[in-house]
Amino acid sequence: MPQQLLITPATEATWVKLKEVSLWEDVTKMFGGEALLSHDANGTQQESLADGTTPGTPAAGSHDGATPGTTATGSHDEATPGTPAAGSHDGETPGIPAAGSHDGETPGTPTAGSHDGVTPGTTAAGSQESLTFKDIAVDLSQEEWGQLAPAYQDLYREVMLENYRNLVSVAGYQLSKPTVISQLEKGEGPCMAESQGPEDPILDVKNKLETKESTAEDDISVKLDHGITRGRLIEDDIVCSPLKKASSYSDTLESHRATCGKGTRRAIWTHKKKRQEGNKLENPESSNVILEQKHRKHKPARKRNKYKLDSIDHPVSCMRARRYPCNVCEKMFKQPIHLVEHMRTHTGEKPFRCKECGRAFSQSASLNTHQRIHTGEKPFACEECGKAFRHRSSLNQHHRTHTGEKPFTCDKCQKAFSQNISLVQHLRTHSGEKPFSCSECGKPFRQIRHLSEHVRIHTGEKPYKCTSCCKTFSHRAYLTHHQRIHTGERPYKCKECGKAFRQRIHLSNHRTVHTGVKAYECNRCGKAYRHDSSFKKHQRHHTGEKPYECTECGKSFSYNSSLSRHQKIHRRNTFRDDPGHENKRQL
């Protein structure tokens, strides 16, 4: 954990040591006396604390004879981290200017030829001021901006605006708002390369690439701060580099670090550019290359799940929403568990099985809902009438009976329905489609429930039983109609004469008495009938159909009434053949 907290260049470590002695001691204790590693201009590592020494102080046994804060006489290869070598023009970083510079002084060390009288241990005026916006900006040209994917454009805008806000609020940045910030706030793309002239940071980077400098200033990495003074940043804030986010609490950093993956578990990190990367900056081939060079994004790691599906593991804070694609239908999911559940629709896997009936389900939620059938639980109750339902969707559909809402309308006849399934079934009346056929007799039906009811004719199943007389029925509607005999209920009343009926079909047949309409006409003889049942009986005269067969002798009849009269003959004959019948007559 301590090793992952801070990795900083030697110049920055020296600055902290000189300006914040107590803070440097805390950092040393945090690392348990181990060395703070940093990268020099040649890409090698230097040890600042390995021998118990601090930056700016030579190790024991040094022959340079240099005192803290000074440069060894005649030494051009090794200089104390706090003071650059004489004549050196490389390795200069903001806040650590070269010897002889009059623009700023090294913290704790006066510049050569300085007339300000700054003594060691003090800082020249202005040396602690915040970095400028150019130091924290990630510059993109208009061409490079256009090559970025929309997701990376949003990421760039978010980072730039956050950096600028931190610069203004913490460092007291009072200059006029940069043009690029105004453009990003309006949702436009940056035009920094075209608008900032010779001081343009992107041109400065290209010039450095052309001269192939190999110093710390060549590093186009994430800056160490958001425009905050370096001492305040290291003292008060902990930084996570992927988005340069600062947190005042270590536990916040830990939670953020957990989402960034193993590749970004360092608070501050630095990338040394390679010389061949200059060509990539000038001729970017893809938005990913540009973003890696401009913002130094970590390379996404590929993960494999049990279905061998690839998912890119971006930090949650770096990408606004993680997406997991299905390789079969290309549907996207936010959570990997949702993708796993979706894949079962392709594989047919049903790992969740009901212990009561053995029925299997692909999702545990479906199993929980199914188990309410066995337990009788109905957790969703209507506030209007108190009726309870097993499913929330059933309750929502029921609400429409109270509100009268019918959102589903037929385009052909403008008839409205409260449920979508009712509209689908209604559309089959226009198309004539009957997709459900009986496997026994081949009779087609528009609805599957009608087929299920019809199959009971062949099987003889009668699952609906009357609790009053124990009579059984093959259809629920038949049981409902029968129960009205016991209750005396007649819910269908004629508006003309006030006569009431138990069934709707009886009311419809009765209305023809008042209207005189005979809607059913025979195509062969032209005879008309008011009722559909009478019309079907008449057609049997022409077809010769005799669907009613006697179980005693096998004789068939066209009408059910004819069969009933015939069966009375068999009952009379049985009564006469009974031996007890003669004894009763004699008595």
Curated annotation (Swiss-Prot):
Instruction: Name it.
Output: Zinc finger protein 69
- Give the ZnF (C2H2-type) ranges: 271-293, 299-321, 327-349, 355-377, 383-405, 411-433, 439-461, 467-489, 495-517
| Pfam families tied to this protein | KRAB, zf-C2H2
Protein's GO biological process = lipid metabolic process; regulation of DNA-templated transcription; regulation of lipid metabolic process
| InterPro entries (UniProt xref) | KRAB, KRAB_dom_sf, Znf_C2H2_sf, Znf_C2H2_type
Which keywords annotate this record?
DNA-binding, Lipid metabolism, Metal-binding, Nucleus, Repeat, Transcription, Transcription regulation, Zinc, Zinc-finger
- Biological source species: Mus musculus (Mouse)
MF terms per GO, please?
A: DNA binding; zinc ion binding
Function field? Putative transcription factor that appears to regulate lipid metabolism.
**Does the entry annotate any disulfide bonds, and if so which pairs?**
none
SUPFAM superfamilies documented for this protein? beta-beta-alpha zinc fingers, KRAB domain (Kruppel-associated box)
Question: Which ranges of the sequence are coiled-coil?
Answer: none
Q: Which PROSITE patterns match?
A: KRAB, ZINC_FINGER_C2H2_1, ZINC_FINGER_C2H2_2
Per the record, the similarity remark reads: Belongs to the krueppel C2H2-type zinc-finger protein family.
